[in-house]
């Protein structure tokens, strides 16, 4: 026989099992709510009631509104069609009671025929459509050959200037007087090369004269020193005529010897009556000292 304690235990056991089952199973309350929401949406779509969608015009900002074009009065001369706005052309057609339907060019032609009949001749060169415009441009390209230019060159005309506009010269400068001296400004390297070339070209004229002819006999007058670039008295002995061999200037020495010239010539031109390939005694002495210092 069952005791009272056994009955209590048996009665509490199913309660605990039910609580364990409830805790182990997830809650289905939100799922049911979602399911009911889906069913409501389906029922609305089934009944044919669609949710209202906002129009894009309602969401436009005030800055996106179309700007109105100011309409000027109708001019006496109608400008070309490409310079007229479509809204302006439509307003002019309404004022003249002309139909503005169709393309812009058609409305332009109707307005010309009604209000500007004298300008109808200008429409001969206007193409009726874009296709006609392409055909006209292709026809022009075929006329002009690839090597020719379509532009026309107009010769310049010599317009005589009136005498009143020509300013009179009062005491004009003496531009045509003979000048005894000339000043030439050239870079140092170019000037040195030019002076060497000038000396070498003039040295060929005096090849028949011996190199020490001027040093053996006293020369009266003045002589031009290549290094100094000035005329010096030629009464003293020691003047030497330079020699050129293999593109180098040589200073003749005793016993048929020659020393290379290390001094740079001046960048000035001598007068036409003086030689420009002579070296003064001081420069000869300086050149000897320079060669000895280089050798030592």
Curated annotation (Swiss-Prot):
UniProt keyword terms in alphabetical order: Developmental protein, Nucleus, Transcription, Transcription regulation
PANTHER family membership: DCR DOMAIN-CONTAINING PROTEIN, DEVELOPMENTAL PLURIPOTENCY-ASSOCIATED PROTEIN 4
Cellular component GO terms held in the UniProt record: nucleoplasm; nucleus
InterPro entries per the UniProt record, alphabetical: Dppa2/4 (IPR039590), Dppa2/4_C_dom (IPR025891)
Cellular localization per UniProt: Nucleus
Name this polypeptide is given: Developmental pluripotency-associated protein 4
Organism encoding this protein: Mus musculus
Functional summary from the UniProt entry: May be involved in the maintenance of active epigenetic status of target genes. May inhibit differentiation of embryonic stem (ES) cells into a primitive ectoderm lineage.
Null mutant phenotype: The mortality of mutant animals is increased at birth and most die within 3 days. The few surviving neonates show growth retardation, but they catch up with wild-type mice by 20 weeks of age.
Assembly information from the UniProt record: Interacts with DPPA2. Interacts with PCGF1.
Gene: Dppa4
Compositionally biased tracts (Low complexity): 23-34
Pfam annotation, one family: DCR
Bias kind Basic and acidic residues: ranges: 1-13, 42-58
GO annotation terms (biological process): lung-associated mesenchyme development
